[in-house]
Amino acid sequence: MQSTHISGGSSGGGGGGGGEVSRSGLSRIRSAPATWIETLLEEDEEEGLKPNLCLTELLTGNNNSGGVITSRDDSFEFLSSVEQGLYNHHQGGGFHRQNSSPADFLSGSGSGTDGYFSNFGIPANYDYLSTNVDISPTKRSRDMETQFSSQLKEEQMSGGISGMMDMNMDKIFEDSVPCRVRAKRGCATHPRSIAERVRRTRISDRIRRLQELVPNMDKQTNTADMLEEAVEYVKALQSQIQELTEQQKRCKCKPKEEQ
């Protein structure tokens, strides 16, 4: 980092970090700003200045005796032109110090005839803070914050509704019993299922035969009643057979020749 300052007398103190002193009182220092300040303090002690002497007063006093500063580097020429414009504004040579914001400093300093930036081609009556241009970062940030909060609320609302719907669907699925689809008749593959199907088929065939043999059996809707009706019919048949057998034993038939 390169920085420049004007020494207080004809011979300045030795600068830190490889400083060079020119005849015009310009000191070139290639070091940190802290080293530059320490060098200024050392020069103040050597020249017997007051302890509370400010940097601005040093620069102001040196401006009255220094004259125009020239340098080979473009950056030094830029700084010298700025310093000349600043120090030549007041005839007394006092540096205009402000304890307010930089905006007030610029507005107060531009009230002169030439202004602090007359060397750069900027007129003194230039309106730095135009009323037509709306530069309110607080308002812009407030608008952005409200827009972001509204978008966030919309996302939360949509996310909350979808989350509630998902929870309700999960609850419905948990409460519901899974539906078991029954296999088609004749399409069972398990051995027990096949055996059960065969048994039911055989029972159905036998009941159908009993319905053909036993009268009024088809009027019954229950299988147990059908079987009871069949049992009663069989008992009746047995009693008839027994009666016929007894009658045959008691019967005595004569041959036709004897008649």
UniProtKB/Swiss-Prot annotation:
Residues 9-20 have a biased composition (Gly residues). Residues 1-25 are annotated as: Disordered. The gene is BHLH80. This is Transcription factor bHLH80. SMART domains: HLH (SM00353). Homodimer. It is found in: Nucleus. Pfam families: HLH.
